[in-house]
Amino acid sequence: MMKNERRSVNWPMIAGVAAVAAAVGFGAAHLPVSEKSPASTQAPEAQKPQSAPVKPGLKEVKIPATYLAAANIAVEPVASAAVGTEILAPATVAALPGSEAVIVSRAAGAVQRVQRRLGDVVKAGDVLALVDSPEAAGMAAERKVAQAKADLARKTYEREASLFQQGVTPRQEMEAAKAALDVAQAEALRAATVAQSAHLASDGRSVAVVSPIAGKITAQSVTLGAFVAPQAELFRVAGTGAVQVEAAVTAADTSRIVAGSEATILLANGSPLSARVQAVTPTVTGSARVATVVVVPAQPTDRLVVGEGVQVRLRTAVADAAALSVPEDAVQNLDGRDVLFVRTQEGFRPMPVLVGTRSGGSAQILSGVQAGEQVATRNAFLVKAEMNKGGGDEE
């Protein structure tokens, strides 16, 4: 009976312990879930930057075109050329054959009148100055004498021809008169040609200094009243038409340059002009032993002045069409990254790029931009400065 009583007492205790254990187990089972739930929702968010870095928002800095001109910021297309396949050569702007004239005096004498001055625009045939010369008087006299002899010979021939028709004189006299007429006319033509080529003035005692082409007077070395010698340069006139650029390259580089290839003319202020190679001389000249590469602008321009010193960037025949390059000044460091400032409608947008080789003032672009895209080159750091001032628009 004692055993039965104990057995009846223990069952309620066991049931109570089981109930307490169940309650504790249930709470323990739910407690980690409730504490773990916020962590589980936050962990993916914390791991996102590690698995897929978020690209910083690119800014566009708005720069008006007037500021570009004032700040001398150049914009050039990304070139399809590998670094090391471009040649940067010194060059000089020259006039095309026939577009520049050196004007001289055709006779010795004193300058009587100066009718044009440095910088004036002239037309072909305009008189620039008059030179009072004894030679002019001599040419005028010879022309008159020759013309008088020709007139006399013509009258003599007409008379002899009439007498021959009448049967008064023999044929020999008429033929002699005809020969004398031919000689006199030839002499008159020679005297007239000499006077015309010397630009003999109508007064018969001075010669005119005449411009043979239309253009602008670029040099003047004449003074009123000064004595000038024959063939002495008095004026220089340059035509207002096209010009060419003559670049000096080494003999080894001539085989790498072909006519028709692309080139870029860099002005004294750094502004670029698209151009192409017109010709390459097959020989070297001068003490420097250099060859000449003739480059012509792709479009007519008035920004090239004859005699101006420029630079020419020549692309060689072995250039890799798949490679890209830009002037080294175009690559800027922004927030620790190499970027190019790509031209937009209202300004520039920084474009991260991967830069390869840098050589000869050019930088190889491996990725980030495409050939032909317009980017800031010269003074690109000014665009970077504008962006650092907070002028960009966050997208």
Curated annotation (Swiss-Prot):
<dbReference type="GO" id="GO:0030313">
    <property type="term" value="C:cell envelope"/>
</dbReference>
<dbReference type="InterPro" id="IPR005695">
    <property type="entry name" value="Co/Zn/Cd_resistance_CzcB-like"/>
</dbReference>
<keyword id="KW-0614">Plasmid</keyword>
<feature type="region of interest" description="Disordered">
    <location>
        <begin position="35"/>
        <end position="55"/>
    </location>
</feature>
<keyword id="KW-1003">Cell membrane</keyword>
<keyword id="KW-0533">Nickel</keyword>
<dbReference type="InterPro" id="IPR006143">
    <property type="entry name" value="RND_pump_MFP"/>
</dbReference>
<keyword id="KW-0997">Cell inner membrane</keyword>
<keyword id="KW-0812">Transmembrane</keyword>
<dbReference type="InterPro" id="IPR032317">
    <property type="entry name" value="CusB_D23"/>
</dbReference>
<dbReference type="Pfam" id="PF16576">
    <property type="entry name" value="HlyD_D23"/>
</dbReference>
<comment type="similarity">
    <text>Belongs to the membrane fusion protein (MFP) (TC 8.A.1) family.</text>
</comment>
<keyword id="KW-0813">Transport</keyword>
<dbReference type="GO" id="GO:0015679">
    <property type="term" value="P:plasma membrane copper ion transport"/>
</dbReference>
<dbReference type="GO" id="GO:0005886">
    <property type="term" value="C:plasma membrane"/>
</dbReference>
<feature type="compositionally biased region" description="Polar residues">
    <location>
        <begin position="37"/>
        <end position="50"/>
    </location>
</feature>
<feature type="coiled-coil region">
    <location>
        <begin position="140"/>
        <end position="193"/>
    </location>
</feature>
<dbReference type="InterPro" id="IPR051909">
    <property type="entry name" value="MFP_Cation_Efflux"/>
</dbReference>
<keyword id="KW-0472">Membrane</keyword>
<protein>
    <recommendedName>
        <fullName>Nickel and cobalt resistance protein CnrB</fullName>
    </recommendedName>
</protein>
<feature type="transmembrane region" description="Helical">
    <location>
        <begin position="13"/>
        <end position="33"/>
    </location>
</feature>
<dbReference type="GO" id="GO:0046873">
    <property type="term" value="F:metal ion transmembrane transporter activity"/>
</dbReference>
<keyword id="KW-1133">Transmembrane helix</keyword>
<comment type="function">
    <text>The products of the genes cnrA, cnrB, and cnrC are likely to form a membrane-bound protein complex catalyzing an energy-dependent efflux of Ni(2+) and Co(2+). The mechanism of action of the CnrCBA complex may be that of a proton/cation antiporter.</text>
</comment>
<dbReference type="GO" id="GO:0060003">
    <property type="term" value="P:copper ion export"/>
</dbReference>
<keyword id="KW-0170">Cobalt</keyword>
<keyword id="KW-0175">Coiled coil</keyword>
